[in-house]
């Protein structure tokens, strides 16, 4: 798949903009605070319905304007898809797919798939478990609408159950219904996440060995109340484990008035050279592990959806040493549409540009195709 055209109106610092991209490599370069990251944010917004930088959609609306527009033409193996999102300061998001209004924004997810690697991702290992869960959820939601449906239902259920736990008198009948739904829906999420981590681990390990020049191994493991030490994660086993945990922690949940059982408590373990990278990894080891994970994500999603997602690299060249930088760019293989932002083309250390590349100079909300990038 690739993004052939991006159109923006009143999006961040872009008043009105239309860009035609290469199906291969697209480099967005220019000084800081000119709008490079805003372009990647717009692509991410069209892929997921959300910004990767803010939880408030109105933050993306240009100052002094009431509503933003983001529109894209996405070329898939099955044909071209036209996506359109509008969002206002006082109005909810509105979605059209191929000109037809959709009631649910979730219908957008999967039409355009992306893998984003930004400097913030370098905190994935040392940050809280919520970031690692979010990584899995975004990946799997783009692959499967069924997973996204289960995730949304589960999040609503946990919120409702937490509200019930805060009541002075708990409706036991309603709690029993919530418990049953939590076990069923939660087990679906645990099984799919555990399977994804099981498949990601050897792929990430392969990339990690190359990046670390065979000095260290990387291993991933999904850590869940629903998965035992033996790693068993079939649906029935996970259900039974969640049921047991609910019974064991029932009094503690009521004392603390919060749901303590379920996939919203899970984590992903990273081990580098046999040591827990979340606790002991150096900054260099963190960078290598996260880079290996992102390359594994790209490969895994390509296998799952039958074509590569877009790769968005936001100013990561400045965060990587020359060896990792060179490996990352060489790993951007043919057939993957890539978007790279940087302040200076020299930062990329590219000796020879591929034939299907385009260079765009970004300056104060304008984007100009560089003559060196005509292809």
Swiss-Prot record:
CDD domains: ABC_RecF (cd03242). ATP binds at residues 30-37. One of its GO terms (cellular component) is cytoplasm. It comes from the Bacteria. InterPro entries: DNA-binding_RecF, DNA-binding_RecF_CS, P-loop_NTPase, RecF/RecN/SMC_N, RecF_2. It holds the Pfam family SMC_N. The keyword ATP-binding applies. Its main location: cytoplasm. One of its GO terms (molecular function) is ATP binding. Keywords: ATP-binding, Cytoplasm, DNA damage, DNA repair, DNA replication, DNA-binding, Nucleotide-binding, SOS response. GO terms for biological process: DNA replication; DNA synthesis involved in DNA repair; double-strand break repair; SOS response. It is found in: Cytoplasm. The RecF protein is involved in DNA metabolism; it is required for DNA replication and normal SOS inducibility. RecF binds preferentially to single-stranded, linear DNA. It also seems to bind ATP. Belongs to the RecF family. PANTHER family: DNA REPLICATION AND REPAIR PROTEIN RECF. This is DNA replication and repair protein RecF.
């Amino acid at each position: 798949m690739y993004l052939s055209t991006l159109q923006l109106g009143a999006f961040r610092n872009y008043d009105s903009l239309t860009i035609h991209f290469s199906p291969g490599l697209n480099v967005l370069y220019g000084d800081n605070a000119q709008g490079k990251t805003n372009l990647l944010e717009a692509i991410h917004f069209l892929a997921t319905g959300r910004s990767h930088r803010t939880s408030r959609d109105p933050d993306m609306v240009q100052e002094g304007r009431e509503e933003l527009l983001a529109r894209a033409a996405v070329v898939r193996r099955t044909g071209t898809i036209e996506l359109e999102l509008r969002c206002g300061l006082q109005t909810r998001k509105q979605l059209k797919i191929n000109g037809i209004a959709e009631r649910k924004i979730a219908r957008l997810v999967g039409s355009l798939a992306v893998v984003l690697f930004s400097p913030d991702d370098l905190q994935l290992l040392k940050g809280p478990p919520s970031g690692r869960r979010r990584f899995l959820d975004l990946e799997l939601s783009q692959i499967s609408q069924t997973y996204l449906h289960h995730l949304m239902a589960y999040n609503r259920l946990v919120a409702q159950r937490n509200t019930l736990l805060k009541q002075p008198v708990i409706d036991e009948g309603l709690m029993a219904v919530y418990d049953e739904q939590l076990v069923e829906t939660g087990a679906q999420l645990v099984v799919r996440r555990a399977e994804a981590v099981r498949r990601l681990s050897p792929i990430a390990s392969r990339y990690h060995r190359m990046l670390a020049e065979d000095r260290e191994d990387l291993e991933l493991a999904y850590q869940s109340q629903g998965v035992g030490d033996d790693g068993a994660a079939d649906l029935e086993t996970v259900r039974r484990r969640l049921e047991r945990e609910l019974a064991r922690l029932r009094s503690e949940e009521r004392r603390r008035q919060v749901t303590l059982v379920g996939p919203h408590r899970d984590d992903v373990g990273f081990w580098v050279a046999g040591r827990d990278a979340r606790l002991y990894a150096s900054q260099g080891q963190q960078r290598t592990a996260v880079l290996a994970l992102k390359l594994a994500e790209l490969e895994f999603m390509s296998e799952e959806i039958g074509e590569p997602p877009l790769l968005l690299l936001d100013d990561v060249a400045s965060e990587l040493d020359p060896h990792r930088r060179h490996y990352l760019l060489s790993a951007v293989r043919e057939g993957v549409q890539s978007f790279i932002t940087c302040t200076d083309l020299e930062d990329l250390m590219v000796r020879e540009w591929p034939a299907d590349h385009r260079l765009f100079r970004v300056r104060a909300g304008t984007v100009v195709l560089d003559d060196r990038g005509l292809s």
